[in-house]
């Protein structure tokens, strides 16, 4: 089984850019950014429970990484960078910590490396369980209206919140709930030690208004590109800033 994706060709010999969206997003999320790199072949993936992969269920990160590996193989992708936001960043970090043939490097925007204390895991398990229950039983517009009131999205203004609520409400609540539970931070291992011992290039993107993830980036001993005038969803709030950072990373 493979994940659904959209592919765009680039110059032969250049590595692929493999884009992984955040929770409740889909393969369209990164396309505005990816279009600015026409020399690179680009693969925009729908993660399980999302977009055209909504019917794909997983039991945890191991399943997601297996599906990612199968998808890359099916497209004959032999050399690539992983670029992921939030949930997609966590999947990318998990995958990068495994042995992946052809892997060139990792770019993560606002992705959590993992919780360190059991009490934090327990609290996150309860929180994600409550959200999952709401996704299953309530209108998605109501759930996402509350979702985007969380502190991590404090930099969004009213119109930005409304646009995201309208967009995310097109999802399937049941499949979102299943993916939220399967890939909760409560079940993700703490990746700090493995990432700090990495042998591959790793870059972090963070909105300057995203204080939580700025602090997390500092724990990773990784080059961090601060995106001006942006919060947690930097590639949406300041796409030009993210394009500039990616261009620097890819040495364009």
UniProtKB/Swiss-Prot annotation:
InterPro entries: AB_hydrolase_1 (IPR000073), AB_hydrolase_fold (IPR029058), SHCHC_synthase_MenH (IPR022485). The keyword Lyase applies. Its EC number is 4.2.99.20. Signal peptide: none annotated. GO terms for molecular function: 2-succinyl-6-hydroxy-2,4-cyclohexadiene-1-carboxylate synthase activity. GO terms for biological process: menaquinone biosynthetic process. Pathway: Quinol/quinone metabolism; 1,4-dihydroxy-2-naphthoate biosynthesis; 1,4-dihydroxy-2-naphthoate from chorismate: step 3/7; Quinol/quinone metabolism; menaquinone biosynthesis. Pfam families: Abhydrolase_6 (PF12697). Keywords: Lyase, Menaquinone biosynthesis. Belongs to the AB hydrolase superfamily. MenH family. Monomer. This is 2-succinyl-6-hydroxy-2,4-cyclohexadiene-1-carboxylate synthase. It comes from Citrobacter koseri (strain ATCC BAA-895 / CDC 4225-83 / SGSC4696). The lineage of its organism: Bacteria, Pseudomonadati, Pseudomonadota, Gammaproteobacteria, Enterobacterales. The gene is menH.
């Amino acid at each position: 089984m493979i994940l659904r994706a959209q592919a765009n060709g680039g110059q032969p010999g250049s590595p692929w850019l493999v884009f992984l969206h955040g929770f409740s997003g889909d393969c369209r999320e990164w396309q505005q950014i990816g279009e600015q790199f026409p020399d690179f072949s680009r693969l925009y993936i729908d993660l399980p429970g999302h977009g055209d992969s909504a019917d794909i269920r997983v039991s945890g990160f191991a399943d997601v990484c297996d599906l990612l590996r199968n998808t890359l193989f099916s497209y004959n992708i032999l050399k690539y960078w992983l670029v992921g936001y939030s949930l997609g960043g966590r999947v990318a970090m998990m995958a990068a910590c495994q042995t992946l043939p052809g892997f060139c490097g990792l770019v993560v925007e606002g992705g959590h490396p993992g919780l360190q204390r059991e009490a934090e895991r327990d609290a996150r398990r309860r929180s994600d369980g409550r959200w999952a229950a709401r996704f299953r039983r309530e209108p998605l517009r109501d759930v996402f209206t509350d979702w985007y009131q969380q502190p991590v999205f404090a930099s969004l203004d009213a119109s930005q919140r409304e646009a995201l609520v309208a967009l995310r409400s097109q999802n399937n609540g049941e499949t979102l709930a299943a993916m939220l539970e399967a890939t909760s931070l409560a079940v993700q291992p703490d990746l700090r030690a493995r990432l700090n011992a990495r042998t591959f290039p790793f870059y972090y993107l963070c909105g300057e208004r995203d204080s939580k993830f700025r602090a997390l980036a500092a724990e990773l001993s990784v080059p961090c590109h601060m995106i001006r005038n942006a919060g947690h969803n930097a590639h949406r709030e300041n796409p030009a800033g993210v394009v500039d950072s990616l261009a620097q990373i890819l040495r364009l």
